[in-house]
Amino acid sequence: MTVLGIITTTLDVAVILIVFANTTTLAGFSRDEVLFLYGAAGVSFALCDLLVSNIDRVSQHIKAGTFDTFLIRPVSSWLQLTTDRFNPNRLGRVLQAVLVLGYAVAVLDLEGRRLWMIPVMVVTGFVIFAALWTLVGAAQFLLTDAPELGNAFTYGGQQLTQYPLAVYARDLVKGVTYVLPMAFVNWQPGLYVLGRDDPFGTPEFMRFLGPAAALALVLAAGLAWRQGIRHYRSTGS
């Protein structure tokens, strides 16, 4: 199944390669630069999908009456849910993303003094996706059909970050920069690594705000999760 996972996710890379079979740049970015952005976001998302995504099964446990079992144990309910039914088959997506990122770093002429940002952006992206999944899980205490809606923010966010944000409308980019900080998964820090200016004209210091944006989203997600737990009513109550 790991091999199947690699083949499935490789289709995303194939789409990028097909695009560049017909053009030399995409919104001013070369093929290898796009692969770099894709790989960086892909590693973050794939690790989060592997380790955290089970949090979106909250509504299933509530409907089945099994969520109470997570509350009576002396371990964080969030931690229990994320480790519930660990699926190693998702390792294929992680491996594929690592390979793409490694290739892009190897072929791009990157300045050595900027490479420190790569692990920072991968960790930051992981935290942002984890916070998004936590918000989706928290919403399920009120909306039992939230998983489908939540996919628009988690898997949809992953799709959004596969390409340079320069391909999207300015208003959308503002939204994913100042409201839902998806731009800090790979776009803003990626511009620093690539030595590129932001086509939208954001100042240079924005390249380094990823950890702060991730922390703010984590605090919001933590608050939402605690509120969800506080307002949860057992099926037996």
What spans do the regions from the language model cover?
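Hydrophobic transmembrane alpha-helices and immediately adjacent juxtamembrane helices
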Residues: 1-237
